[in-house]
């Protein structure tokens, strides 16, 4: 909690400072870059993937920039019907866009080693022709201004090996997804601003919506296998954190740019979808504990790896703490969770708050928990434009309270699910 509060506070300070300092105008790019938009896909809905690709390429075609952009759809799809749909969508895309738009599509018969090997194969076969690659997920969408800005930044900073944008969630339709989207847009920015400030040039990579210097990545970001607890060699599942650490170890800057607007991704529609994704992430993040001792990693890169793993280990730790508390309190005189007794089976016996200090501690804990949300909400309410986008102060406040309520409701479910995910990862 303290890290989140500190990061959000730094983000608030950074936000106010930026508003008071006039932004400098960048000169034209130092070098024109050939940029590949690389989209790895696996059994995805072709309409969504190719629809997003069409929107990005159409905007880039009319964008005022000297950079050149090409699209690579890298498919690991194993379902023959979806593969046929991808081929038809590719033909439609080819016929829709101007003739000089460079588009490639390739499908592997076997999805060996998943996404890291897709990128490695692309680098070995095509990477030499492109100074940079913009890695996108199947559900990623970026505006032309965001893409051009990232290419300009990479061009201006020859020491940068990777620049990560901060994707906003979009396309939410269910209550769960809308809650995630509201939280991301409203409360995510102070955390993103703060992360960009303290991470500086030792940032992280989230696997998509990031531009990477191809030569830098090819020279130092090859992934080894990591041994499991049982001693077997395993693929590194959450490869992005590790690749960022390897780039920084080789001397390349890994930057996080929270100020880039127009970077988007979708969010899981239901709690079940979220949990299934979280299980994969949990397994990958726990693998990072075996990579932390790697020689030469920057201290901040090690912190990113440890922090990702600890975020999942806290769930079983909290669950164990609750179980110990329940067992130790299992008695007539010491029971801390029983609100009924034999003499008064229908009337609850509420815990006695011994003094003012207990209330202060309770308020402090909840204040720390809610501080990032409160910081984001205050800034949103202070802006007339933001209030108007949310439908006014009353509607924003109602959404804010609903988000807090649903977060509290989902918290014990996610604690149990993450505990199960940790146990399955052992």
Where are these regions (language model features)?
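Alpha-helical membrane-embedded segments
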Residues: 1-14, 367-370
